[in-house]
Amino acid sequence: MAYRLQTPDTGIALAERETTLIEEITIYITKNYFNNIKANDVGDAVGLHSDYANHIFKKAFGTTISDYIAELRIAHAISKLLTTDMSITDIAYECGFNSTARFNATFYKKKQCTPREYKRRLTKTQQISL
């Protein structure tokens, strides 16, 4: 009988623990996305196996840790493309990509164009609206 009474508490504690872990994961990613981190590094940083870290992260956000890191990097890269005169190579490395080839491939996958094309399109749009 005591086991049954403890089961719901265990379920709640697990949910609370998962919430805490997800917060730790997102904080770690936000503080380190510009480094060459991988999902394994994130799991290690919060004391979890990477598969479990990915599982609870996907349950919470509907995306994998790797995709979340890529989205965050691309968002920051777009900001830098539009607000600085940095080279694409410098932006790639500053946003955590280990090569311009990887940056271009990831950018293309997410935005269906290269970083250079993206900047050119937005520059044209801004000139037209002036």
Question: Whereabouts are the PLM-identified features?
Answer:
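An amphipathic alpha-helical interaction segment
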Residues: 1-13, 17, 52
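C-terminal edge and immediately downstream basic/flexible tail or linker adjoining helix-turn-helix-like DNA-binding
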Residues: 124-130
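Hydrophobic recognition helices of helix-based DNA-binding modules
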Residues: 1-6, 29, 57, 81
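Basic/polar phosphate-binding segments, predominantly the helix-turn-helix DNA-binding elements
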Residues: 28, 36-72, 92-118
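A short, Lys/Arg-enriched amphipathic alpha-helix from helix-turn-helix/homeodomain DNA-binding modules
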Residues: 10-37, 43-46, 68-86
